[in-house]
Amino acid sequence: MKLNLYVLTPKRIIWDCEVKEIILSTNSGQIGVLPNHAPINTAVDMGPLRIRLLNDQWLTAVLWSGFARIVNNEIIILGNDAELGSDIDPEEAQQALEIAEANLSKAEGTKELVEAKLALRRARIRVEAVNWIPPSN
Amino acid sequence: MSCSHLSTAWSSSALASSASTTRRRSPPRSGLLVRCSLRELRTRIDSVRNTQKITEAMKLVAAAKVRRAQEAVVSSRPFSEALVEVLYNMNQEIQTEDIDLPLTRTRPVKKVALVVLTGERGLCGSFNNNVLKKAETRIDELKQLGLQYTVVSVGKKGNAYFQRRPYIPLERDLEVSSVPTVKDSQAICDLVYSLFVSEEVDKVELLYSKFVSLVRSDPIIQTLLPMSPKGEICDVNGVCVDATEDELFRLTTKEGKLTVEREKVKIETQPFSPVVQFEQDPVQILDALLPLYLNSQILRALQESLASELAARMSAMSSATDNAIELRKNLSIAYNRQRQAKITGEILEIVAGADALAG
């Protein structure tokens, strides 16, 4: 059995292939989706999307909040933006993380603090997506 | 004796010719009557030719960019289609429930935010002026209705315009990149979202140029917030268009000419869907979904506005090129006429000299 996975953003289609399994971050925690999953609607939180390909390889993508719908072995994920792990430059992501940490320590005021925390979280997720090691099985 | 006379005649002719060449005359005073030296005419013709090359190049660049803008709209269609379908299904499933969402909450309107999309550069005919005139008209209407208003300006031309008019309250002026991105639309989306949810304004309207054809684009006003839970798109008069109808413009070549076909695509919504669980509260899910829809609407408006601007620039540069060609032709005629007159004059002088010598 397979799952049809679509990851759509206003800019382009990020993913449009059959997969074996995905692990998705939702607003109420991470969920794993295998074939014949119950129909479900969920809001997607900022976080990684793990994709297990048909050849048992794992890929990582990064989602920035959105919506996911799982019906009849078809997964539609809508988000404002998304990135495949392979498209992220590790050095650039690491630098962005360090810059975000520096900005957080320098932030003054509530608004700046909230923005700095969000930027830091975003940078951290991107770094994790690049450095993630898939489970061996 | 004879040889000496001949030498004198040639010298006299040369002097006259030199005087004629260096004499300066007044600039042209009537339409086609050109009076200036041949050198000045030559310089002017070269200058017009350079201008023509520039305007022609700009026209071709604008045409290429229109095509690219079209591709951007096409590539964002899958997202819009999926979003509308999901929104439709969601509403079917939770129809019986009484949902209170911040983005769909309707209040008595006391203050309106007007988001105005203009271009980043000029040289595109009356594109920017049309949008700004429409904005002024809308502002006057709001004044007559006794409503407060504030303006969110997007694009350099609009920013410059509103900054020169302190009497118009400007909430924010934003600049976008030359090609609309999700980041740009998200910035606008975040701003109008916070304005509306914090109840600073009760209604948000979006003013932009809708791309109709290569020679026409209409500034239209669309209500962004409050939005219908079903995702309908409403104009200021309350006329709603079903969101399942998605208009798409396409740049084609029909009989060797560039034309634009605008077709309506009916997005199919599945008639039956299984009972779907909600991982979170439906309100929370719609809270996540509607901002996506708002963002895609703004992005679409940015893309249409850019396409309109590029089409207007294409037309403007095409007209400028035609004008340059015509002007160059007229100047060439005047140049040749003057050159011919000069040569004729010189010949007459030579003949007169010869006659005098013979006499």
UniProtKB/Swiss-Prot annotation, chain A:
Keywords: ATP synthesis, CF(1), Chloroplast, Hydrogen ion transport, Ion transport, Membrane, Plastid, Thylakoid, Transport. It is found in: Plastid, Chloroplast thylakoid membrane. Its main location: plastid. InterPro entries: ATP_synth_F1_dsu/esu, ATP_synth_F1_dsu/esu_N, ATP_synth_F1_esu_C, ATPsynth_dsu/esu_N. The keyword Chloroplast applies. It comes from the Eukaryota. The keyword Membrane applies. GO terms for biological process: proton motive force-driven ATP synthesis. It is a peripheral membrane protein. One of its GO terms (cellular component) is chloroplast thylakoid membrane. F-type ATPases have 2 components, CF(1) - the catalytic core - and CF(0) - the membrane proton channel. CF(1) has five subunits: alpha(3), beta(3), gamma(1), delta(1), epsilon(1). CF(0) has three main subunits: a, b and c. Produces ATP from ADP in the presence of a proton gradient across the membrane. This is ATP synthase epsilon chain, chloroplastic. It comes from Sorghum bicolor. The gene is atpE.
Curated annotation (Swiss-Prot), chain B:
GO terms for cellular component: chloroplast thylakoid membrane; proton-transporting ATP synthase complex. GO terms for molecular function: proton-transporting ATP synthase activity, rotational mechanism. Disulfide bonds join C234-C240. It is found in: Plastid, Chloroplast thylakoid membrane. Its main location: plastid. Pfam families: ATP-synt. The active site is at C124. GO terms for biological process: proton motive force-driven ATP synthesis. InterPro entries: ATP_synth_F1_ATPase_gsu, ATP_synth_F1_gsu, ATP_synth_F1_gsu_CS. The keyword Isomerase does not apply. Residues 1-35 form a transit peptide. Keywords: ATP synthesis, CF(1), Chloroplast, Disulfide bond, Hydrogen ion transport, Ion transport, Membrane, Plastid, Thylakoid, Transit peptide, Transport. It is a peripheral membrane protein. F-type ATPases have 2 components, CF(1) - the catalytic core - and CF(0) - the membrane proton channel. CF(1) has five subunits: alpha(3), beta(3), gamma(1), delta(1), epsilon(1). CF(0) has four main subunits: a, b, b' and c. Produces ATP from ADP in the presence of a proton gradient across the membrane. The gamma chain is believed to be important in regulating ATPase activity and the flow of protons through the CF(0) complex. Inceptin is a proteolytic fragment produced by insect larvae that previously ingested the protein. This peptide mediate plant perception of herbivory through the induction of volatile, phenylpropanoid and protease inhibitor defenses such as ethylene, jasmonic acid and salicylic acid for example. Belongs to the ATPase gamma chain family. This is ATP synthase subunit gamma, chloroplastic. It comes from Zea mays (Maize).
